[in-house]
A protein has these predicted regions:
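PLP-dependent aminotransferase-like
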Residues: 67, 71-109
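Conserved PLP-binding active-site segment in aminotransferase class I/II-type PLP enzymes
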Residues: 1-68, 72, 93-94
Length: 109
């Protein structure tokens, strides 16, 4: 694709590379000590009595969040127009209706 514009580029530095190598060498790819450590540190960062759960993707995170707030079939969920398709797809998966709204041209809010 000649004119491809990336949605977002990840910032991957030496620290991130070292952590991935450490995880691979530990034998744990998904669950395990690094995931538990992340969940605990994120909960501590939030500073409230919260529980954090690491998931495999943003789509899974959106699914859990919508389930947690009680979205059910027939509900309407506002989603931004400038987003990844999974934002609206997970709403449909739950039987709800995505309502796509545009963003402010200056602030993108």
């Amino acid at each position: 694709m000649k004119n491809f514009i990336p949605f977002a580029l990840p910032e991957i530095g030496e620290e991130e590379i070292a952590e991935v190598i450490d995880s691979l060498r530990s034998g744990w790819i998904t669950t395990g000590p690094k995931a538990k450590q992340f969940e605990q540190e994120f909960s501590n960062y939030l500073g409230a009595n919260v529980q954090s759960l690491a998931v495999n993707s943003a789509t899974s995170g959106l699914h859990l969040a919508l389930e947690a707030v009680g979205v059910k079939p027939g509900d309407q969920v506002i989603v931004p127009s400038y987003t990844f398709t999974a934002t609206a797809e997970i709403v449909r998966y739950l039987g709800a209706d995505p309502v796509i709204v545009d963003v402010d041209r200056k602030t993108f809010n």
